[in-house]
Amino acid sequence: MAQVDRLGQVTNVYDLGQYKLHHDYVFDDNGDLLILASDSKGDSVEDMVIKLNISTGDVEKVLDLGELFPDYKASCVENTDGELDWMHINTIQWLGDEEVILSSRETSTILKITDLYEEPKVDYMIGVEDFWKDTAYAELLLEKNGEFVSQGGQHAVTYVEDAGLPDGQYYLYMFNNNIGVSQSRPEYDWAEAIENVQSKPYEGTTSMYYKYLVDENAGTYELVDSFDVPYSGYVSSVQDMEHNTVVDSGFAGIFGEYDEEHQLIRQFTMEKEKFIYRVFKYDFEGAVGKYQFLAPKS
């Protein structure tokens, strides 16, 4: 793990030992880093969270999803690369009070984890009911409020508090890739579960920006905003600005900005070797907005 300053100069490098960083990280309230990781000595990949103390360099495993989903993990099979990628976590968001939101591409499910540092447990899940039926975890699903197509293979799930909402309510927005592929459950037919879901990383009809209103008190979630964006089966990101939205369709090599009416302001296409992992826009004093590109995951 490398630390860089605003000029892009490396100021520190941290050794994560047996753990390998992937996809995403976030700071907790103490300034420590929570990092999505794989254990190089383990039997599976992309299913753990580690904590890095940036002052001391100490590394600690704080979450192993295999311990929370033992029966489900045992039912999964290795992918074509010979890896047991049964969850494929691609996003982590810090909510405070030792709570995090995780996004699982392999299961097309969003997870809320509580009591992260003491005794982690799954508080709820947002996903396709059919996928989790006949498992011990189906009761953890929030109820869908309204008629809409569930997210598929989502990325860049973002937690947003709103002072205008009652306690227990908040927003989650995301890049809904609209893909259903689970190599760890090859018998599962996503086309039967999600209407018009795609199955190929490059060739597909459309992906979407999705925004959910989550009501923990009622145990529900509803789609409050969405619009179509260029298709990307994997990777990709969305970022809400004050009024606009920045969208990166990573496998298409396309990124652009949309206004509050979801009308495209400007779009760019990049030559790419593989994909554009994520795109963010930042404002710097005395300058026009700049785009920062994050390196692809390993």
List the predicted regions and their residue ranges.
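Histidine-/acidic-rich catalytic cores in large beta-rich domains
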Residues: 1-298
